[in-house]
From Swiss-Prot:
Family to which this protein belongs: Belongs to the bacterial CoaD family.
Keyword rRNA processing annotated: no
Residues where ATP binds: T8, F9, H16, G87, L88, R89, E97, F122, S123, F124, L125, S126, S127, S128
Species: Prochlorococcus marinus (strain MIT 9515)
GO BP term (any one): coenzyme A biosynthetic process
Protein name, as recorded: Phosphopantetheine adenylyltransferase
């Protein structure tokens, strides 16, 4: 069974990484799909985010990382995944993610969305929050993989 885990991952957090590891155990093959959203200016270019994720998952054998543009259901179909993984931190995430899941189902009835609650150790994490803490010099080593921490510190030193 193959599951698609889509997101912008700008940057990858330990919460994302935890979901990837748990999904590998539950579903086998996991495709991490990094969205290139041309309407937003990301902190890290797509190529850097792909490197960050590949570095963080190098110890995992059933994970692949790709980039995509457009509809997530089209990406899932392209990689032959009939499941889409979404992480839930709070009830507010559920309301938003459920709308997206219903939209995806209306576009492709063969694809199901699976929700996994985040590990309580990471339930407060978001990429936006991590960037905010890093911007003001706060400690983020418990929030992101080591390489992402280095990249964020370097980014905010320059900007």
């Amino acid at each position: 069974m193959k599951i698609l885990y889509p997101g912008t991952f700008d940057p990858l957090t330990n919460g994302h990484l935890d979901l990837i590891q748990r999904a590998e155990k539950l579903f086998g093959n996991v495709v991490v799909a990094v969205l290139e959203n041309t309407s937003k200016k990301p902190t890290f270019e797509l190529s850097r985010r792909l490197i960050q994720i590949n570095n963080a998952i190098s110890h995992l054998s059933k994970i692949s990382v790709i980039s995509y543009e457009g509809l997530t259901v089209d990406c899932a179909q392209d990689v032959n995944a009939n499941l889409i993984l979404r992480g839930l931190r709070a009830m507010s995430d559920f309301e938003y993610e459920l709308q997206i899941a219903h939209t995806n189902k209306s576009l492709n009835s063969e694809i199901e969305t699976i929700f996994l609650s985040t590990n309580t150790n990471f339930s407060f994490l978001s990429s936006s929050l991590v960037k905010e803490v890093a911007k003001f010099g706060g400690e983020i080593n418990h929030m992101v993989p080591e390489a992402v921490e280095r990249d964020l510190k370097e980014y905010f030193k320059k900007n």
